[in-house]
């Protein structure tokens, strides 16, 4: 509490009051200092505002002066603008005049330099100068000023006439030198003068000279080849191959040069002309081949062939050797001709693909086709729409090839049937016709495929190959096999004993069913051999679809052979295998007790059970299938496993008596038997899935006996409610007896 100085009573109070006054004085001084320091920025800010106000007043005054000046000088501004425009026009005229004079001067200098270049025989420089001079506007060259200043004593004609005269002179010179280099086969000089034609505005003439030169080379080489006598079987195929490869090499080597100096559009024109030469020479080669090989006569000869032996074999009639039909054309004669014709078709179609890709690339580089999806869906170039060679192939070569190939294939099958033998000394047993027919099938299929002609391939496969295989080869095999099956079935029904059936009939059956199985495998391997190369061989998207469809149709033949095997197995299995399988299982379970005590169960499980030992020793002998093909063995083993599983199910449900411990022993025994039956092959174990569900149910302990509940609890997929009910009822009866 503060005390007034007048109220102090002693010295200590006076000292305290003095101290308080000093503290208060110090606080007051600090407060004054803060106020002074805050006042300085405020003064500075006020000074700045005052300065800005003075400048703003000055700025407003200047704006008023400018406003008055603009308002009073409107007419003067329009006059100034008009004068400026006038000066600009005069300046532009002067620039145009200077440019005009400069262009005329440059044109005159070009002509003078051109005259000197020609005098010194500097043809590249001369051509370049002509190109520069020709780039000048015709209005300038034909103007009065140019007519007045350009002519000289050395070049007195009008400027345009002088340029035309020099151009024609150079054109004549280049044409002469180009043909001279062509006669001398001087590739360097040919290229030199070929590049100069576009510079003097003679692109068309340059391309014409190029085409005539190389067209002459193509024709002369083709004629030289045909002038030689045909010394070997593939003479005309070799001649045609040489022709298309020669044309392709010319196009491949010179396309970059032509494209560089003549542009892509003109390059396509050159390719069309060279392809036209290839057409003409190729047609000559094909027509000559038809004459020399007498192909039309061959086609006429085979048309009257009746296939008497083949029909007799198909109808299983005896054939008298004296009635053997005279062979019109030998297969040895026909085979090289087919190779020759196919090679020509192949080379032509490969050439079409090459040209089409090149034309597409040139079109894209020229900007006429820039769709990126076009390259993935290549189509044939329009060049071939009017091709003579293409027409000759469609009208003459391919129809003849189709008839000859069809005869070759069917006659080969007829010969195979005539020479048929059964091979039963080595396993698997089979007929000789399988190797013979499938070898020829692969040969003609691949020959048709590699013609690279979707038209020929689809027609041959769909109209000849498939019908002949189905109506001749398949019918022959199926008729013989089903006949043997019916004979065996009839004998079994009469004798009631499979062992009494003649061994010859069984031998015929195994041989024929193996032949059907091998035929299916061969057909698949033939298709696999070409399917991976479909897109590589047939580049056109449309062709790929047609060929793929024909291959799929061909592959459907395998279904016929597969069904034939299944049908024959349905006869063979119940007669020869099923009784042995059932007897084997009965013998294995004979005398085996499954009503066991705990002690009996423990003792029995210490070693392999007798039922397992018995089956292990006889199962391989029961399925003695070594004469069958591996695929047929697998099919029969699969059928055996299915029947074994079904038979054991029946034993469990209706014959074998078991209790709880016996069910456990039974489950162990059958699990071991399944391993023996399936030979540890996973694809055979699936036949026992239903049996394994029954085993699970046998050893399952549950308070619930409702079948539906058990099916849900154990996730039983294959057992019906009736089967589950029967098993649970049998378990209940066993437990009741216990």
From Swiss-Prot:
Bilayer topology term: Peripheral membrane protein
Membrane spanning residue stretches: none
UniProt-annotated location(s): Golgi apparatus membrane
Keyword Protein biosynthesis: no
One GO BP: intracellular protein transport
UniProt GO cellular component terms: cell division site; cell tip; Golgi membrane; Golgi transport complex; nucleus
UniProt entry keywords in alphabetical sequence: Golgi apparatus, Membrane, Protein transport, Transport
InterPro entries, per the entry: COG4, COG4_C, COG4_M, COG4_N
Domain of life, source organism: Eukaryota
Transport is among the record's keywords: yes
SMART domains in UniProt: Cog4 (SM00762)
Protein family (similarity comment): Belongs to the COG4 family.
Summary of the function given for this chain in its UniProt record: Component of the peripheral membrane COG complex that is involved in intra-Golgi protein trafficking. COG is located at the cis-Golgi, and regulates tethering of retrograde intra-Golgi vesicles and possibly a number of other membrane trafficking events.
Assembly notes: Component of the conserved oligomeric Golgi complex.
Identification of the protein by name: Conserved oligomeric Golgi complex subunit 4
Organism: Schizosaccharomyces pombe (strain 972 / ATCC 24843)
Lineage of source species: Eukaryota, Fungi, Dikarya, Ascomycota, Taphrinomycotina
Gene giving rise to this polypeptide: cog4
């Amino acid at each position: 509490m503060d005390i007034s100085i007048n109220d102090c009573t002693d010295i200590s109070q006076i000292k305290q009051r003095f101290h308080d006054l000093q503290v208060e004085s110090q606080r007051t001084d600090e407060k004054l200092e803060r106020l002074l320091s805050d006042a300085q920025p405020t003064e500075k800010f006020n000074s700045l505002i005052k300065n800005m106000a003075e400048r703003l007043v000055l700025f407003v005054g200047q704006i008023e002066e400018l406003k008055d000046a603009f308002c009073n000088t409107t007419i003067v501004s329009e006059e100034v603008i008009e004068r400026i425009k006038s000066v600009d026009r005069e300046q532009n005229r002067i620039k145009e005049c200077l440019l005009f004079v400069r262009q005329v001067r440059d044109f005159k200098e070009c002509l003078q330099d051109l005259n000197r270049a020609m005098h010194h025989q500097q043809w590249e420089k001369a051509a370049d100068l002509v190109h520069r001079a020709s780039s000048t506007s015709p209005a300038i060259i034909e103007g009065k000023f140019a007519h007045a200043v350009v002519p000289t004593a050395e070049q007195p004609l009008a400027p345009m006439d002088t340029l035309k005269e020099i151009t024609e002179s150079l054109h004549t010179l280049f044409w002469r030198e180009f043909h001279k280099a062509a006669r001398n086969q001087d590739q360097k000089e040919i290229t030199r003068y070929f590049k100069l034609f576009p510079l003097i505005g003679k692109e068309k003439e340059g391309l014409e000279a190029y085409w005539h030169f190389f067209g002459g080379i193509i024709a002369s080489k083709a004629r030289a080849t045909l002038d030689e006598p045909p010394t070997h079987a593939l003479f005309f195929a070799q001649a045609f191959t040489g022709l298309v490869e020669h044309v392709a090499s010319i196009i491949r080597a010179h396309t970059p040069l032509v494209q560089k100096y003549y542009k892509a559009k003109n390059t396509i024109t050159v390719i069309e002309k060279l392809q036209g030469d290839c057409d003409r020479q190729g047609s000559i080669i094909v027509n000559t081949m038809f004459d020399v090989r007498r192909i039309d006569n061959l086609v006429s000869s085979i048309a009257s062939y009746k296939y008497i032996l083949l029909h007799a074999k198909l109808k299983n009639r005896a054939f008298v050797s004296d009635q053997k039909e005279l062979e019109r054309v030998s297969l040895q004669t026909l085979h090289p001709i087919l190779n020759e014709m196919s090679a020509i078709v192949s080379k032509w179609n490969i050439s079409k693909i090459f040209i089409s890709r090149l034309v597409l690339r040139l079109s894209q580089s020229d900007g006429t086709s820039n769709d990126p999806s076009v390259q993935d869906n290549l189509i044939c170039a329009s060049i071939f729409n009017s091709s003579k060679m293409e027409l000759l192939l469609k009208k003459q070569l391919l129809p003849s090839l189709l008839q000859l190939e069809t005869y070759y294939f069917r006659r080969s099958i007829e010969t195979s049937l005539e020479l048929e033998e059964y091979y039963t000394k080595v396993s698997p047993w089979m007929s000789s016709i399988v190797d013979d027919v499938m070898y020829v099938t692969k040969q003609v299929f691949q020959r048709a495929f590699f013609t690279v002609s979707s038209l020929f391939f689809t027609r041959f496969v769909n109209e000849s190959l498939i019908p002949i295989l189905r109506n001749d080869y398949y019918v022959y095999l199926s008729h013989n096999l089903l006949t043997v099956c019916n004979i065996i079935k009839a004998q079994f029904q009469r004798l009631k004993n499979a062992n009494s059936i003649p061994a010859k009939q069984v031998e015929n059956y195994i041989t024929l069913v193996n032949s059907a199985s091998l035929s299916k495998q061969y057909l698949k391997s033939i298709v696999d051999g070409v399917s991976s190369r479909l897109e590589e061989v047939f580049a056109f998207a449309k062709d790929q679809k047609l060929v793929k469809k024909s291959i799929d149709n061909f592959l459907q033949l395998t279904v016929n052979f597969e069904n034939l095997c299944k049908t024959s197995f349905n006869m063979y299995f119940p007669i020869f295998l099923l009784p042995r399988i059932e007897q084997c299982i009965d013998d294995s379970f004979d005398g085996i007790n499954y009503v066991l005590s705990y002690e009996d169960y423990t003792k029995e499980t210490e070693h392999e059970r007798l039922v397992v030992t018995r089956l292990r020793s006889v199962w391989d002998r029961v399925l003695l299938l070594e004469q069958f093909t591996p695929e047929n063995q697998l099919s029969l083993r699969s059928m055996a496993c299915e029947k074994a599983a079904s038979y054991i199910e029946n034993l469990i449900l209706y014959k074998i008596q078991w209790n709880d411990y016996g069910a456990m022993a039974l489950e162990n025994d059958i699990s071991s038997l399944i391993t023996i039956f399936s030979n540890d092959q996973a694809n055979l174990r699936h036949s026992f899935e239903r049996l394994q569900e029954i085993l699970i149910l046998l050893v399952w302990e549950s308070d619930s006996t409702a079948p539906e509940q058990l099916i849900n609890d154990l996730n039983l997929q294959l057992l019906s409610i009736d089967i589950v009910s029967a098993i649970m009822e049998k378990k209940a009866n066993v437990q009741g007896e216990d």
